[in-house]
Amino acid sequence: MKEKEKLIIETALKLFAQKGYNSTSVQEIAKECKISKGAFYIYFPSKEALLLSMLNYYYDKTFTRILNIKTKGDSPRTAYRKQLTVLYENILEHKDFISMQLKEGSLPYTEEVEQCAKKIRQSSLQFHIDSLLNIYGKKAEPYTAELCFLIEGISQIYLECMILLGYTVKPSQLADIIMNRIDDMVKGMSERNDKPFITLEEASSLFGPLTHGRPDPLTESIVKSLRDKINSLNTNSSLELSESLDILEAEMKKKTPKLAIIKGMIHNLTESEALAKDAEQLKYLLKQQHI
């Protein structure tokens, strides 16, 4: 993303948080950025396009930070605690983004915005699901969807207290609090043999496919990026790279993927300078998913 685009996004975000999306004009955003209205439209064809870019920008930024945390050698619990800490740090660093979403009637309910929000929620839920199953195993399996909703709900209330009411809690402390609450919920639900309020299948019908081991939306977006870049290459190795990605995708979808094949195909992709960065990021994401 170009620096000017980042400037427009971050400036618009502050204005949306202060005045609301509907009450902020393109002219005001341009003026605050010290650019002309015409220059604004060079980067974004409409205010709605700006909003979609804004949502995707902060989504990618947040999950990239989470997935770049060093967790090698950590237990699943320690890794999840680190990831929650960074998640909360990122949210608190971007209070304007949260304020914009909390402002009543701030965001337009268009199909594009709804799909973007659905993608973000799906990715967030899948992140929690994989972590819960890695930590608690079969004990949490019947309750994964319900636990995700409870984690998101509790986190939101606590973060609103910190952002709107001035409660001072370190992100690491909040992560500890949430982990303790999860322990209590898993223990209580499993010991009572509760019937889940919502199943994983029901949650999938609302937010898109949610399963243990399914590639998360960020992984899928990197695979798509690799595919697009391979298709745009005009080299003798394009066919071989395309075949490597085909084999990699097929192996990732298996219930028990073979690590040697995964490593081999990613190695083939990293040999291309144009694909190396995406391939390395994909390698890291798959490690995080214990593939």
Swiss-Prot record:
Q: What is this protein called?
A: Uncharacterized HTH-type transcriptional regulator YuxN
Q: Which Pfam families match?
A: TetR_N (PF00440)
Disulfide bond annotation, renumbered to this chain: none
Which residue numbers delimit the DNA-binding region? Answer: 25-44
Gene Ontology MF terms in the entry: DNA binding; DNA-binding transcription factor activity
The cellular component terms of Gene Ontology attached to this UniProt record, alphabetical and capped at eight, are:
protein-DNA complex
Domain of life of the organism encoding this protein: Bacteria
The UniProt entry, under PROSITE patterns, shows: HTH_TETR_1, HTH_TETR_2
Q: Where is the HTH tetR-type domain?
A: 2-62
- List the keywords (alphabetical): DNA-binding, Repressor, Transcription, Transcription regulation
